[in-house]
Regions:
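Nuclease catalytic cores that cleave nucleic-acid phosphodiester bonds
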Residues: 82-230
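Domain-level signal for Mg2+-assisted phosphodiester chemistry and nucleotide/NA-binding surfaces
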Residues: 1-108, 161
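Extended, helix-rich structural scaffolds rather than catalytic motifs
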Residues: 10, 228-233
Length: 233
């Protein structure tokens, strides 16, 4: 019988980690994460280590989005979260946050609380999971990971290779009792999780015109209709 694995993704951490993935491949532009492939790559890594079958039963993504009163057009972000749900099979938990006029300002506390609450909920549910894969190596997650291990669950944090002279406690991997497997660094898997886009012909949702595109999301709008769609969103 295969082990059940759930993936818990800190969306803010993953977004900020893209620069490291760019550098790993020697590129500054053109890198995108294959979100559909990402959970499976990490589960396969665990399966190879244990020499056991590992079944991915659920992928949970936690993130934030500027609130309506912040005055930012968030249509693109909502489309991204919809893409994760419809095309990648993710379960998303997204919180509206007042960014105070600064789109780059982030409040990680929402994401951390949501992720750890969900992790402990499933850890306490009999038969829900055997292994929790946590994408994000924030040391603030350590108490929740310790608690999940008390329920008999095995934990696999996924982080980035530490910078030179970094303090051990700046990452989950430097803390005791939070990991049941060798460290997994996302930058080591950069080539594996890189999205390779295929050119295909799609029909515009507004005008019905066919156009070649690499967009794989649920709704497609041609070059002429794209601006109209964004202005109406």
């Amino acid at each position: 019988m295969s082990l059940k694995a759930m993936v818990f993704i800190d969306g803010g951490w993953l977004y900020r980690s893209r620069t490291t993935l760019f550098q790993k491949l020697g590129e500054e532009n053109g890198f995108e994460i294959d979100y559909a492939k990402l959970p499976r790559v990490l589960c396969d890594d665990i399966a190879n280590y244990l020499d056991e079958d590992v079944s991915l039963v659920r992928t949970n993504y936690f993130g934030t989005i500027p609130s309506a009163r912040s005055g930012f057009n968030t249509a693109k972000q909502y489309s991204f979260y919809e893409f994760l749900e419809k095309n990648c099979g993710y379960e998303t938990e997204i919180h509206e946050v007042d960014v105070g006029g600064n789109i780059d300002r982030s409040d990680d506390s929402w994401t951390k609380i949501s992720l750890t609450s969900s992790l402990l909920y499933y850890a306490a549910m009999p038969g829900a999971l055997d292994v929790a894969v946590v994408i994000g190596d924030d040391p603030d997650l350590a108490p929740a990971l310790n608690r999940a291990r008390l329920f008999g669950k095995r934990i696999q944090p996924v982080g980035l290779r530490p910078m030179q002279n970094a303090k051990p406690e700046s990452s989950l991997f430097g803390l005791p009792r939070v990991c049941d497997f060798p460290p997994v660094y996302l930058d080591d898997h950069a080539a594996d999780v890189r999205l390779v886009r295929e050119i295909r012909t799609r029909v515009c949702k507004l005008c019905g015109r066919e156009e070649e595109t690499t967009w794989a999301g649920p709704d497609f709008f041609c070059t002429q209709c794209r601006g109209k769609h964004r202005s109406n969103s």
